[in-house]
Design a protein with these regions (language model features):
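Juxtamembrane and boundary regions of transmembrane helices in multi-pass small-molecule transporters
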Residues: 2-34, 124-127, 164-167, 184-282, ...
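Membrane-embedded alpha-helical segments and adjacent helix-loop junctions characteristic
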Residues: 8, 35, 66, 70-185, ...
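Helical membrane-embedded segments and adjacent short helical loop/helix-boundary regions
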Residues: 14-23, 41-46, 59-68, 98-116, ...
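Lipid-exposed faces of alpha-helical membrane segments in multi-pass integral membrane proteins
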Residues: 18, 22-29, 48-55, 70, ...
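Central hydrophobic cores of alpha-helical transmembrane segments in multi-pass inner-membrane proteins
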Residues: 27-30, 47-57, 72-81, 111-117, ...
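Flexible hinge motifs at transmembrane-helix junctions and intramembrane kinks/re-entrant loops
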Residues: 36-44, 51-70, 253-257, 283-288, ...
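Structural signature of hydrophobic alpha-helical transmembrane segments
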Residues: 39-48, 105-114, 167, 311-320, ...
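Alpha-helical transmembrane segments of multi-pass membrane proteins
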Residues: 112, 144-158, 184-206, 231-236, ...
């Protein structure tokens, strides 16, 4: 562990120590203020809960699972004791708790939970590691080709490992093993280039593939719930893949320019990867079974609405059931349950509940009206709206360590903002999907995403190295959003 990290843990910052109490104080102030005109009491209180959530998530003053529990209680009590304008009576804590638990009954929640099991199966069998090593064994020993291999690993794994942190957790030990086997210093530009790329390419392909990240499921759920449109895996891929491919190419060029490796070719590099692959032995029966089930699942994802009507969540649940069955499966409940990050699952469910409550109490609509008014968006062109909202999301993400939390708080408001626009021909579904891509832009700081922190923990680069890659990468991403918004996405009818 880094000395800096250990020091920070020993002496947490002011917001880390007092963020929870500040969040409670801000919540109390908001709730005690007079309810604004056009906003219900329940909506007023939900804005307070949302601000509380943003503060505790941004400061990580309390852990995400604990914050999820606190948010559930706040929704149950504050909404429960608010008057229901439709009936003239209080909502009641039972109805409030129902709002707090709504996210746990969504199909998106089932998909995220199932994805955790799929990621655990990949880790248990070692199939993800084998895939990564096979790719790296084919690219050669030149420094630039090793970098290309890391990018290809991130791309391929995003299809099969539907967990951001699981993909990075798979790649980091492999890349670290390669760095040590190559005899390259940990603080070399080559080592830093590879490890930063591991994190950044993961964020890039979070955009490209619907099932690659939990925050995508947040947006898909709200689009379905609010707008009645179900976005298939293929719909998402066709729209987002060009962006991710162009970003991957930009990442490759950028990393070679910013952190040019000290060596052109690694002596014995190819032999090292081959040795690591040989140490794994022949592909096991469990790996084969998982590979077949994963390929079948990928087939069902890509052909949804084309060859069949089975949605992504249902097909994933079927796959997980097969993986848990005797003889057919590759894992047992007792050994798998402890490998699942249940905190992430709970946070996701509560995030959906928070957004749903903002929508049902009309708090999101009221906030949207304020945003439209402040930024004069009502009659702006779609590209201007896209530019302003993209910059807004990039800036606000600087304070977040969880893209899932950011999506939960902001996507309902974005949908409401887009619904308020009077610009003719605005595609609310398409614009929401594109702005969800921006939610995954955790490129600038290590603390902006869990995958960044995993890579940072290897001690192969400094914060300023990450920032040097993150700022230009973010600017390129913004430029691509605007370019595709004016061309490809416009031709598709998304903008």
């Amino acid at each position: 562990m880094r000395k800096e990290t250990a020091l920070k843990q020993a002496q947490p910052g002011f917001m880390k120590r007092f963020g929870f109490y500040i969040a409670l104080a801000v919540l109390a102030v908001i709730v005690l203020l007079p309810t604004p005109e056009g906003l219900s009491v329940a909506g007023h209180r939900m804005i307070g809960v949302m601000v509380f959530s943003v503060i505790v998530w941004a400061t990580t003053a309390i852990s995400y699972p604990v914050s999820a529990g606190v948010i559930m209680v706040l929704i149950a009590l504050l909404v429960g004791f608010a008057p229901n304008e439709a009936t003239g009576r209080l909502y009641g804590t039972s109805a409030g708790l129902g709002m707090a638990l709504k996210g746990f009954s969504s199909t998106a929640f089932c998909l995220v939970a199932a994805a955790m099991f799929l990621a655990a199966a990949m880790t248990k069998t070692g199939l993800d590691k084998r895939i990564a090593l096979m790719i790296l064994s084919k690219v050669g020993a030149k420094a630039n080709r090793v970098l290309l291999g890391v990018i290809l690993c991130g791309f391929i794994l995003s299809f099969f490992v539907p967990s951001t942190t699981a993909r990075v957790a798979c790649l980091v030990p492999i890349v670290m093993g390669m760095i040590k086997a190559f005899g390259v210093p940990l603080k070399s530009r080559f080592a830093g280039m590879l490890m930063i790329t591991v994190a950044q390419v993961d964020s890039v392909w979070n955009v490209g593939i619907k099932t690659a990240a939990a925050q995508n499921m947040v947006a898909v759920n709200f689009i379905s719930q609010t707008l009645g449109v179900d976005i298939s895996w293929l719909d998402w891929f066709v729209a987002a893949a060009p962006f991710a491919v162009l970003m991957s190419a930009a990442l490759y060029k950028l990393m070679l320019h910013i952190m040019p490796p000290e060596i052109d070719e690694i002596a014995g590099g190819q032999a090292t990867v081959t040795r690591l692959l040989k140490e794994m032995g022949k592909i096991s029966a469990d790996e084969l079974k998982l590979l077949v089930i994963s390929l079948c699942l990928l087939f069902f994802w890509t052909t949804e609405k084309v060859l069949h009507s089975i949605d992504t969540s249902t097909s994933t649940m079927v796959a997980i059931t097969l993986l848990m069955l005797p003889k057919i499966g590759v894992m047992h409940w007792n050994e798998t349950v402890n490998k699942i990050n249940w905190g992430t699952v709970v946070l996701f469910g509560v995030g959906i509940s928070l957004g749903s409550a903002l929508l049902s109490t009309k708090a999101a609509t009221w906030l949207a009206n304020q945003i439209v008014s402040i930024f004069a968006l009502e009659s702006s062109t779609t590209l201007m709206v896209l530019a302003i909202m993209t910059v807004f999301l990039i800036v606000i993400h600087m304070g977040f360590a969880s893209a899932t939390g950011l999506a939960s708080a902001i996507i309902p408001i974005i949908i409401s903002v887009l619904q308020q626009l009077k610009t003719p021909g605005v595609n609310v579904v398409g614009m929401t999907m594109i702005l969800q891509y921006v939610v995954s832009f955790g490129f600038i700081l290590p603390v902006n995403a869990p995958q960044n922190m995993i890579a940072y923990g290897t001690d192969t680069f400094e914060v300023n190295d990450f920032v040097k890659s993150g700022i230009p990468l973010t600017l390129i991403a913004f430029a691509l959003i605007m370019l595709l918004g004016a061309t490809y996405w416009k031709w598709m009818g998304l903008v």
